[in-house]
């Protein structure tokens, strides 16, 4: 069915990201053996961290897909409020990811403030989602099982945002590392 097809696609992309990550890392290690100017060595070091961040985003995407499948297969129900919170957070994470990639690809520092602001919003959303979920559980609106999946999803989204910020700020000589 469609969900399984999506899972296979996400998993295949993650395997491809792992393959590329390995090859790119090998190339960068080889390139670093040559007498590169200091500026180039620093840039190469920054790119190495970007490769790691992209690979970790792929890992989180697979984890999120696993949680989504668990939700479906175990017939876990989220409250409307919880589902709305997750969808809102997902949208913000996609925004920060797209802006981070744009900053990195175009070396455009003009969007740093926007990425910083979005990171703060996402960090607060994680806290708000977790607190809201605890309140919903206490009120009997959702189960412990849904809580575990909900928490994993929210944490996964927030970690993707952190890696996206690292990618954006990698174009600076002094980086903001999350």
Predicted segments with their positions:
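Cytosolic, long alpha-helical scaffolding segments
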Residues: 1-178
């Amino acid at each position: 069915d469609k969900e399984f097809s999506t899972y296979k696609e996400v998993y295949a992309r993650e395997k491809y990201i792992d393959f590329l990550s390995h090859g790119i890392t090998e190339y960068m290690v080889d390139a670093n053996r040559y007498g590169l100017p200091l500026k180039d060595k620093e840039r190469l070091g920054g790119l190495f961290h970007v490769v790691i961040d992209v690979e970790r985003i792929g890992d989180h995407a697979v984890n999120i897909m696993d949680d989504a499948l668990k939700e479906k297969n175990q017939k876990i129900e989220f409250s409307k409020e919880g589902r709305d919170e997750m969808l809102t957070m997902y949208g913000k994470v996609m925004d920060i990811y797209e802006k981070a990639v744009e900053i990195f690809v175009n070396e455009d520092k003009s969007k740093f403030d926007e990425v910083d602001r979005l990171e703060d919003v996402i960090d607060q959303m994680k806290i708000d989602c977790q607190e809201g979920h605890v309140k919903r559980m206490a009120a009997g609106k959702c189960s412990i099982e849904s809580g575990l999946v909900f928490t994993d999803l929210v944490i996964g989204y927030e970690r993707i945002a952190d890696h996206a910020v690292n990618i954006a700020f990698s174009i600076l000589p002094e980086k903001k590392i999350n």
